[in-house]
Regions:
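N-terminal accessory targeting/assembly segments
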Residues: 1-101
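P-loop NTP-binding catalytic core
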Residues: 75, 79, 83-151
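Conserved P-loop NTPase
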Residues: 114-122, 278-298
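Hydrophobic anchor at the beta1->P-loop junction of P-loop NTPases
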Residues: 156
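Conserved lysine of the Walker
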Residues: 164
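Hydrophobic positions on the alpha1 helix immediately C-terminal to the Walker A/P-loop
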Residues: 167, 171
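P-loop NTPase switch/communication element
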Residues: 175-219
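Conserved P-loop NTPase nucleotide-binding/switch module
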Residues: 225-287
């Protein structure tokens, strides 16, 4: 398997004092956590790492570990908004901003609520930067066992940070070399489109619906692109399930991911789960083990 990181693109957003330590870590970072007046935390899968007073990476946390100042939190926020906060207001209210390269920055603070809806987030106090990574070949085992010879309806399930998006990205690359694929990339994490061009390899015959909601993307893809299969990440709402079922009824295959801890969880949440041919349950990183279930045997 070949791993491709976009760390160089990502490092530019961080305060200068922190860039060298992040760059020195090299590949392998999965998350970078910044909190106001708290130590910067570098996550390597489940390992929690810190930066000591000499700029070195350490597993030990003490009073000398590098802390993120309030000024650096504000600087990082303006950097990821490209100094135009109002342009990202909708993303901010949704709780995340997607950067070039497909990296996603989750943010938290104090919600401003009007009419039962979040209209702004003020006093932002923390960020979780999820590092986007292409792992070419990661999806080959699933592809060879499920899609050998014909397309199937497949659900990729797992806990948060279990690698669902990375698996989907590689399956998209593989499927897009043989079939007409429509990719609904609501958060710009899979293809990482920048200036209209996917930065990640999602297959030569893949049409990317970048920034579309899953419901809108599914409806549009079915209507205008005649796909053999539609791929998208993190199905969850009843509207999305409804459009998935509609696409299946139109003879289009679906390959989607879902947050789920067990097969029983999936059965409870998706009434038409038997319409899927296979369910793939992912284990936790870094082992990335998975189990493939045939729904007609469940």
């Amino acid at each position: 398997m070949k791993t491709a990181d976009n760390m160089q693109d990502l490092i530019q957003y961080f305060p200068e004092r922190l860039r060298e330590s992040i760059a020195a870590f090299g590949n392998g970072l999965t998350e970078i956590r910044l909190r106001r007046e708290k130590p910067i935390i570098l996550m390597r899968n489940s390992d929690m790492l810190f930066v000591d007073s000499n700029g070195k990476i350490t597993k030990a946390v003490d009073s000398e570990c590098v802390k993120v100042t309030s000024a650096e939190i504000d600087s990082f926020f303006y950097a990821i908004c490209r100094n135009s906060v109002h342009s990202f207001q909708e993303d901010i209210c949704s709780g995340f901003i997607t950067l070039s390269g497909g990296h996603r920055v989750g943010l938290c603070g104090t919600a401003v609520v009007r009419g039962g809806k979040i209209t702004n987030i003020k006093n932002i106090n923390g960020f979780n930067v999820r590092v986007s990574r292409e792992i070419i070949g990661l999806g080959e085992d699933i592809y060879n066992k499920i899609f050998c010879g014909e397309l199937k309806n497949v659900l990729i399930a797992g806990a948060p940070a279990s690698g669902k998006t990375t698996i989907l990205r590689d399956l998209c690359r593989l499927l897009g070399s043989r079939y007409k694929v429509s990719l609904i990339d609501e958060r710009s994490e899979i293809a990482a489109v920048y200036s209209g061009v996917p930065q990640n390899d999602v297959g030569m015959n893949t049409d990317v619906f970048d920034g579309y909601s899953k419901a809108d993307g599914l409806e549009t893809a079915v209507r205008v692109m005649s796909p053999d299969i539609i791929i998208f990440d993190e199905a969850g709402s009843q509207d999305e399930f409804g459009y998935m079922e509609h696409a299946m009824n139109c003879g289009i295959r679906i390959c989607a991911s879902i947050h789920a801890s067990s097969i029983e969880d999936i059965k409870r949440r998706i009434p038409f789960w038997k319409s899927f041919d296979h369910i793939v349950m992912l284990g936790k990183l870094p082992k990335q083990e998975h189990r493939i279930f045939r729904t007609d045997e469940l």
